[in-house]
Amino acid sequence: MRAMPLSIGTIHFVGIAGIGMSGIAEVLHNLGYSVQGSDLSENANVARLRAAGIPVAIGHDAANLGNAQVVVVSTAVPRDNPEVQAARKRMIPVVRRAEMLGELMRLRWSVAIGGTHGKTTTTSLVAAVLEGAGLDPTVINGGIINAYGTNARLGGGDWMVVEADESDGSFLRLPAVIAVVTNMDPEHLDHWGSAEAMEAGYRQFVSNIPFYGFAVLCIDHPGVQRMIPDLSDHRLITYGLSPQADVRAERIMSDRNGATFEVRLSERVAGRERVLAPMRLPMLGNHNVQNALAAIAIGIEMEVPEVDLRAALASFRGVKRRFTKTGEVAGITVIDDYGHHPVEIAAVLRAARQAGARDVIAVVQPHRYTRLATLFEDFCTCMNDAGKVIVADVYPAGEEPIPGIDRDALVEGLRARGHKSVVSLGSPDHLAEMINAMARAGDYVVCLGAGSITNWAQALPNQLQALIETTRRGAGGMR
């Protein structure tokens, strides 16, 4: 396959530390291209890229371009960005992130994973299955894969696994041989305009695969199932918990360390079925069993031996900020999770219940005013598996506030719909005291959101420990 010439010159990434941009930059660098970039602030991704040998400037300034011959931007970068303006003035090509990802994908046979939820975990699981089979895949993911310590991996094999971003429609540019759709829920309607237009985008995503490829679709989701009649000219494999799935999980047994399940394979044309011996997945929640089924379906189609499938799942180490345990203090378990859509929040809280939690305390930081406004009713009804809910201020992610759409509106909305215990968080500084007062041994404290709440989740175990020790010392002094 024909690749971009290494002589193309230095490639400059505006916003290089973004989770989508950093993976592409890292793989290009490892392939031998000259890569540099800029970002607004110091963070873990900046440090990781610098450690890999990629220069990163802090702040956006025309001077950061240096001798760059190509500039890569995401849709989050505004047209008036000084580096973008300087590139256009110098007639340097300005390339969208998805276009550059598409160029990378032309170097390999590619698997693209799309969907509203579960993309990052499914991408990681597919990568684990292909790696376990000795196929040495290249991987570009939307989250940090714990086994790699990064969101990107340059492999020497013929396959690439990528997370496909539907938020701006750019996944339609990706030249995939295998397409996965995990689910479809209303999201990013600022781009799509309507749920119907979004579903049409997913149909096009699947339709773009070549005749020698195939699509893997989660039949459990009504929106995904609705697509099937329109895709009858393509090779389709369905998966899920439904009896109608080609690759189906049965006899799911959950414990605090994960799930064990059998897999029933159905060949619709031949009319045959077979059941694989039980699989073990060290992740909580039926939604993660569904994610694993997508990887199993791809592995079966690619003739990965069953023993390798089983080993890959059993040894899977997860993804950062996907039900990540940050600590346990006095029997209280603290979880950090990226979930910020009502469907994700409900699935994560259900998983905490499946883990055997005595009670579940949800700490929720709504992400973006527009999302809270668009999905307000869903936010008000997605937390029933939490015995107690603490609601923080909205993380704006650059948005302006919307009157009547804020922390207090969500608190009142939850109460009005019958939730028995909902309180607001005045400041992150008060979180540890609130948790110390309401949590007991055996409880799970689940911190949910795509914003700064991850920092609170990381700090909370030590803060709780300090409060407990202070209380003990005080009690000892009174004797």
Swiss-Prot record:
PANTHER family in UniProt: UDP-N-ACETYLMURAMATE--L-ALANINE LIGASE (PTHR43445:SF3), UDP-N-ACETYLMURAMATE--L-ALANINE LIGASE-RELATED (PTHR43445)
Entry EC no(s): 6.3.2.8
Family: Belongs to the MurCDEF family.
Organism: Acidiphilium cryptum (strain JF-5)
Residue numbers binding ATP: 115-121
Compartments reported by the entry: Cytoplasm
GO MF annotation list: ATP binding; UDP-N-acetylmuramate-L-alanine ligase activity
UniProt keyword list: ATP-binding, Cell cycle, Cell division, Cell shape, Cell wall biogenesis/degradation, Cytoplasm, Ligase, Nucleotide-binding, Peptidoglycan synthesis
Protein name: UDP-N-acetylmuramate--L-alanine ligase
InterPro entries tied to this protein: Mur-like_cat_sf, Mur_ligase_C, Mur_ligase_C_dom_sf, Mur_ligase_cen, Mur_ligase_N, MurCDEF_pg_biosynth, UDP-N-AcMur_Ala_ligase_MurC
Catalysis performed (reactions): UDP-N-acetyl-alpha-D-muramate + L-alanine + ATP = UDP-N-acetyl-alpha-D-muramoyl-L-alanine + ADP + phosphate + H(+)
Pathway participation: Cell wall biogenesis; peptidoglycan biosynthesis
Gene Ontology annotations of biological process type: cell division; cell wall organization; peptidoglycan biosynthetic process; regulation of cell shape
Coiled coil residues, start to end: none
Gene Ontology cellular component annotations, sorted alphabetically: cytoplasm
Protein's job: Cell wall formation.
Cited Pfam families: Mur_ligase, Mur_ligase_C, Mur_ligase_M
Superkingdom of the source species: Bacteria
